[in-house]
Structures are given as structure tokens and as C-alpha cells.
């Protein structure tokens, strides 16, 4: 098979990306599970790539660039200031460090030893997630904090959070993700913000994969953390935005624990261009285009034996539309879990969203999926399942 046929993002002129992966012995991937750090984040637009290339050709005063980028991101999010970082996990460590050490140079350089500073970080047990295997509590510890989990995974009364706030509390943490964090019967963000205000304790929000760049700052959170690749289409990067004094404290950590977490000029200009492109498209337009695209794909996949396909909105209510695949084990000759393994085993390795395996379901997420990637998904599913009856679904089905 020609590498240009199976790699959805190869350069059509040279195939250089695929060839480089092959030279390294690395199998190309089609990500139908969204922009995922283990799968290389996101693919970049031509505009983002150009911005990174331009940055690579010149020297710059990085202090000035960080400040200017912070002002740009603050305007985009409606916050007082912003601090670029290498990603959401780094953002959590830096945000905690800012709440523990502030801008005091000696305290900054002593971290992760907090000394006599308040360093307890209160979070609901259902929000104690991991960043690709690295526990959130570990990121808190990197910033000099100590995670204090309250409640149970499936229920956290407001009184438990309020009672956990003491003179040793440095911040409250809230994770927005409905895929990774448990929100059922938990304390909603508005109530957490109220608790923080009552006790004079800042609230840190991990909004890594969220769109709506102004929503979380407007919620009253003091610091909000975003990932660059997850929703924005940026290279490996992220940023913290929010209250001016706390963002200044985040920036102060560049001389401490954040030294290995700073964004270089190339990724930083790529991030800014990605934000420009993301905010240029109205959310309603993006959702409508996504729904139309997934509706056409669902119609094709629904004709494959053993599969029932329909469009489904993100369970959290976000305007993200996917194809929901329900696998009939008898008709398909395998379970949803086995089908997911077989999709990953080929070339290219195709990753479907598998958070609903316990229901016998898989999902196709469009956010990281190119048109060529869609064809790879359809082709592989046909190859695996047509032995159990039915006929191939041609391109005409998508028209």
C-alpha cells in the first residue's frame, strides 16, 4: 500500500511526514477520538504552521514576547492577564505554585517546598483525574501544594467542601471535563466560587479541552487553564488566564518550577495564530458544520453489517457532534472492545473514542479527523465487518 493512501495528513507532494515516521519505525495514526496528547495532540492548519516557521527565523526578547502574548490571550478570554505554558498539566502545577508562593522570589525558588505557606488544595474526589497517567495530585505537589480530596467519587455535599477550607488552604480546584471528572451530585462551579469568595481563597479551573474561551473566566474563577491542542488547534502549549495578580504570580514561576514548562517562540506564535483562527469562526457555525459532516458519515457507517450508527451530541451538552456506533456482537462477529483493538492494529492505526465500551459502543470524533481520515475509518470498518454480510458503502452515500 502506498504511504500516501494510508496516512491522512501526508504531504501530497512528498509524503515526507509519513516517510519520516516510517524511517523511525513508527506507525502513522488516524485519530477519531479527538485531539489527544498520547496521539500527538492535533494536526496544524497552514496558518499555524506558517506562524511557527516565521517565529523560527528570528530572535526575540522572550520576556517581551511572553508579556505581549499574555495581553493577546487576556483580550481573547476577557481576563485581566494570561500566562503561556506548555500544557494543561503544567498549567495546574504553575497555578498552584502561584497560589502558594505568590511573587516572592525566595519562596518561588524554594518550591516545591512550601515552607510555612498555606498549601492545601481542596478538590472534589470525583475531580481527582490524571493527565494521561500523571495524577492531578502530582501536578499539585509539583507546585508545592498538597491535594485534599473531599466527598465521594459519586457525591460531594457542599458542606464537605466548605468544611475542608482552613487557614492552610491555598486554593480550590475544579475540573470541567465530563469525560474524565465526575460531576453527578457534586458541587457546581458557581457554588465553589461562592465558597472561595466567602473564605478569600482563589478558585483554579482546569478547562483544558473546553471551547467558549470567555465562559470560564466569566464564571468568577480566579485562574482558568486551557490546553492549546485540545480544542484550539494549537501546537503543544496552553495558557493560564484570570486575575491579574495571580497571573503575575504564575509568570514569576518561570524562575522556579516553571523553568522547564515555558513555551518557546515557535509554539507560542503557533498558539496565538490558532486562537485567532478559532475565535474567527462562530461557535454555532462550527457546530452546524460538524453536525452535517457527522450526519453524512453516520449514514455510510450505518450500512455496514454489525453496526448501528447515528449522530450524538457530547453528553455534557457541549456543541460537539460525533458518530455513535453501537456494535451488535452477533452480527459483527466480535465485541466493541475487540473491534476497537482491530482498528488500532492495522496501518494506519485507527483510534476510535472508546469511553462507552461498557455499553458496547464506540464513537467517531470529528475534531482531529481529516476527510482522508474519515475514508480510512470507513474503509477499515468495511474490511473488518463485510465478511458478515452487506455491501460496501461507496462515496456516493456521503453525497
From Swiss-Prot:
Regulation of protein activity: Activity is dependent on phosphate.
Protein's recorded name: 5'-C-glycyluridine monooxygenase-decarboxylase
Source taxonomy: Bacteria, Bacillati, Actinomycetota, Actinomycetes, Kitasatosporales
SUPFAM superfamilies from the UniProt entry: PLP-dependent transferases (SSF53383)
Positions of modified residues (N6-(pyridoxal phosphate)lysine): 230
Assembly and interaction partners: Homooctamer; tetramer of homodimers.
EC number: 1.-.-.-
The family this protein is said to belong to: Belongs to the SelA family.
Necessary cofactors: pyridoxal 5'-phosphate
Record-listed phosphate binding positions: 179, 318, 322, 353, 367
Textual note on the cofactor: Requires pyridoxal phosphate as an oxygenase cofactor.
GO molecular function, one term: monooxygenase activity
UniProt entry tagged with the keyword Ribosomal protein: no
Noted pH dependence of activity: Optimum pH is 7.5.
Function of the protein: Monooxygenase-decarboxylase involved in the biosynthesis of the capuramycin-type nucleoside antibiotic A-503083. Catalyzes the oxidative decarboxylation of 5'-C-glycyluridine (GlyU) to uridine-5'-carboxamide (CarU). Is stereospecific for the (5'S,6'R)-diastereomer of GlyU. Directly incorporates a single oxygen atom from O(2) into the product CarU.
GO biological process: antibiotic biosynthetic process
InterPro entries in UniProt: PyrdxlP-dep_Trfase, PyrdxlP-dep_Trfase_major, SelA-like
Reaction(s) the record says it catalyses: (5'S,6'R)-C-glycyluridine + O2 = uridine-5'-carboxamide + CO2 + H2O
PANTHER family cross-referenced by the UniProt entry: L-SERYL-TRNA(SEC) SELENIUM TRANSFERASE
Natural source organism: Streptomyces sp
UniProt KW keywords: Antibiotic biosynthesis, Monooxygenase, Oxidoreductase, Pyridoxal phosphate
Pathway: Antibiotic biosynthesis
Pfam families: SelA
